[in-house]
């Protein structure tokens, strides 16, 4: 619960209307009513403003709506996220080690840590202040988890792997499983021991059922601020830069390096031992088989500059007609050749 003036101070916005109105929750513009605050970031929803009964609306400068309290800001979508956090995202009170959890005596737990039933915390594990381990989390020996982390149900972190501060790991993720390393011996495959670790820096979010393999030697590294969607596979010795986005079902093969501020769309596949430069965007379902330079947009399999891919995709639609045309031309050529021979 907060007043509109308080929320304006939080996001650095300007109030138009009654700043003393009390707001209880954030709601979609279609269903927001009295006591709710909503937002409009996409221009196509502006028409809904005239019918809203919300107590306040977050909008960009220049938008007017008589009779509606407005919170004016430069970035309504970012403001929405901050207000949603302020009104809804309250962390539960710390509960310590709950009945049904098993914590090795050698483990070190910081102040205000919560360990839910079904958790297993191994030898010499360190868990930082304010971190919550939800039911069924398993931390192998020598794992380090930083402060104010949320490790959700069923997450497994294998030996010696490290999580920084404020890391969020969604249910079912596996961090530090063996990398896919096998040496052919002429008859079969000899398993290569995977003796490295996974290191995840501060403010990273790992989605549900993500798998991040430990390095064969050294470190599989996820740098600060990166966000990983559900069902992503990151192989051994991969390095992901800062503030990079990996959308669902991305797969990155071993030893590839993705730069800072990159975005890989859903189901992008990256071959091994490649380098993707900073600020690179790759469209969904693309296949990357060679290094990509920084600051460009790519699509397709194999990847090509996005504009070239658009042209190629447009040509694909014409292929049936082109095939028919070529077939007709071939027949005409054959007929002409036959006439020439007959002369």
From Swiss-Prot:
Pathway: Bacterial outer membrane biogenesis; LPS lipid A biosynthesis. The active site is at residue 236. The keyword Chloroplast does not apply. It comes from the Bacteria. One of its GO terms (biological process) is lipid A biosynthetic process. Its EC number is 2.3.1.191. InterPro entries: Hexapep, Hexapep_transf_CS, LpxD, Trimer_LpxA-like_sf, UDP_GlcNAc_AcTrfase_non-rep. Gene3D superfamilies: Hexapeptide repeat proteins, MurE/MurF, N-terminal domain. It is an enzyme of class 2 (transferase). GO terms for cellular component: membrane. Catalyzes the N-acylation of UDP-3-O-acylglucosamine using 3-hydroxyacyl-ACP as the acyl donor. Is involved in the biosynthesis of lipid A, a phosphorylated glycolipid that anchors the lipopolysaccharide to the outer membrane of the cell. Belongs to the transferase hexapeptide repeat family. LpxD subfamily. Homotrimer. This is UDP-3-O-acylglucosamine N-acyltransferase. It comes from Syntrophotalea carbinolica (strain DSM 2380 / NBRC 103641 / GraBd1).
């Amino acid at each position: 619960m907060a007043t509109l003036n308080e929320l304006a101070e939080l996001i650095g916005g300007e109030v138009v209307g009654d700043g003393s109105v009390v707001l209880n929750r954030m709601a979609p513009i279609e269903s927001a009513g009295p006591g709710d605050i909503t937002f409009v970031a996409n221009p196509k929803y502006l028409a809904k403003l005239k019918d809203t009964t919300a107590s306040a609306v977050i909008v960009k400068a220049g938008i007017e709506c008589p009779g509606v309290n407005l919170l004016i800001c430069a970035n309504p979508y970012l403001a929405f996220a901050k207000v949603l956090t302020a009104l809804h995202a309250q962390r539960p009170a710390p509960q310590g080690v709950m009945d049904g959890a098993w914590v090795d005596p050698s483990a070190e737990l910081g102040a205000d840590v919560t360990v839910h039933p079904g958790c297993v915390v191994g030898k010499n594990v360190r868990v930082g202040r304010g971190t919550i381990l939800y039911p069924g989390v398993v931390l192998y020996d020598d794992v380090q988890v930083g402060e104010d982390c949320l490790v959700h149900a069923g997450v497994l972190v294998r030996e010696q792997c490290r999580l920084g501060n404020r890391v969020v790991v969604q249910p079912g993720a596996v961090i530090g499983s063996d990398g896919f390393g096998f040496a052919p011996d002429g008859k079969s495959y000899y398993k290569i021991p995977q003796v490295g670790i996974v290191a995840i820096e501060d403010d990273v979010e790992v989605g549900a059922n993500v798998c991040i393999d430990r390095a064969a030697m050294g470190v599989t590294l996820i740098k600060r601020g990166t966000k990983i969607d559900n069902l992503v596979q990151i192989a051994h010795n991969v390095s992901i830069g800062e503030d990079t986005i990996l959308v669902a079902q991305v797969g990155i093969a071993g030893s590839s390096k993705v730069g800072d501020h990159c975005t890989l769309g859903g189901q992008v596949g990256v071959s091994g031992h490649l380098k993707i430069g900073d600020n690179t965007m790759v469209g969904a379902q693309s296949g990357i088989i060679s290094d990509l330079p920084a600051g460009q947009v790519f699509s397709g399999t194999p990847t090509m500059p996005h504009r070239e891919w658009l042209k190629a995709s447009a040509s694909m639609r014409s292929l049936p007609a082109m095939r028919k045309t070529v077939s007709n031309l071939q027949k005409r050529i054959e007929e002409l050749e036959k006439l020439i021979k007959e002369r």
